[in-house]
Amino acid sequence: MKKMFFTVAIAVSIVSVTTAFANPDGLQQKKNENQFAESFKQLSRDTAWEQKEKVDLKFNTYHPQGMTKIGDLYYMSSVEILEKPVKYEEPRDGYDRTTGKGIGHLFVFNQQGELLKDIRLGEGDMYHPGGIAFDGESIWVSVAEYRPNSESIIYKVDPKTMQPQEMFRTNDHIGGILRDGEKGNLKAVSWGSRTFYEFDSKGKVLSKDSNPSHFIDYQDCESAGKDNMICSGITELPQQGSSTGKYELGGLALLDMKTMEIEHELPISLVSSQGHTVTRNPVYLENTGEAIKLFAVPDDDKSSMLVYETTKLNTK
């Protein structure tokens, strides 16, 4: 499996800023916190998504993981793989593969796809960033070994100074992390989102539960108003017949952040020009009031950000 987290990447935020490099003090007040979740519940497999924009990113994106948007700027985590992990024939010391080598990135880019900042994250074998999320003050990023049941560093990044701060370390591959509100505990998912975690701000594990859903592996998540989060991701299924390729089933899910129970989910059949499901890599959702916008970077290396919008929703 690849990164297997929740990086929306889907990242979902209903907060915006007015300054160029994200002054948290300039955040506009949150409006209609529950509207996002209610609008999302109107989506189905029959929802029409219209592509509004394609922004070619003017830098090597490597293997994108998670994304969030603050004002007019986009923040995207990515892993640059220098040496791919190799599967063992038999597990060794509890691991199923080598560590590999790589570099963790948090890219900042503008609406024209121009790279403004490349923040390096990670240490040693922990070089694989996961899904990211903005809590109204800081961006939270997990950086793990590129293998399950391993180790992770949890950072928060000040979008004003662009400086990362290590918050704690934990003994599992954390594929994505977000904060429950600006001051709440941290919600996280493991490799393939098979396990849900709740941490306090110092890294103490408050709860650890199995994910009951096997529809998709959450790739990226972010808050969607009060008490809710939206996650995006994929699962790879075998093709029928003689094909040796994998079919990428994409999807979105709305979860209750307190109980981690699914409130609504739907498949996403949109694909990129390279044939990847758009929820394969980072996804960010934005509630416009009348519609929902979906920002996605599904392809590696030479990537484009694809922007879709739903038809008008009934927001009464």
Question: Where do the language-model regions lie?
Answer:
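Short, conserved, GDST-rich strand-edge loop motifs in beta-rich repeat architectures
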Residues: 77-101, 144-148, 233-249, 302-308
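A short helix->beta-strand "capping" segment at the edge of beta-propeller domains
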Residues: 34-60, 117
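Loop/turn-rich, solvent-exposed surfaces of beta-rich toroidal or solenoidal domains
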Residues: 214-261
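A short beta-strand motif characteristic of beta-propeller blades
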Residues: 51-57, 114-122, 163-168, 204-210, ...
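Beta-propeller blade signature
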Residues: 93-112, 152-160, 245-259, 307-315
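Repeated scaffold domains used in trafficking and secretory/extracellular systems
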Residues: 62-66, 124-131, 171-181, 214-223, ...
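Residue position within the beta-strands of beta-propeller blades
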Residues: 76-77, 141-142, 188, 231, ...
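Short coil/turn segments that connect the beta-strands within blades of beta-propeller domains
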Residues: 71-72, 136-137, 182-184, 226-228, ...
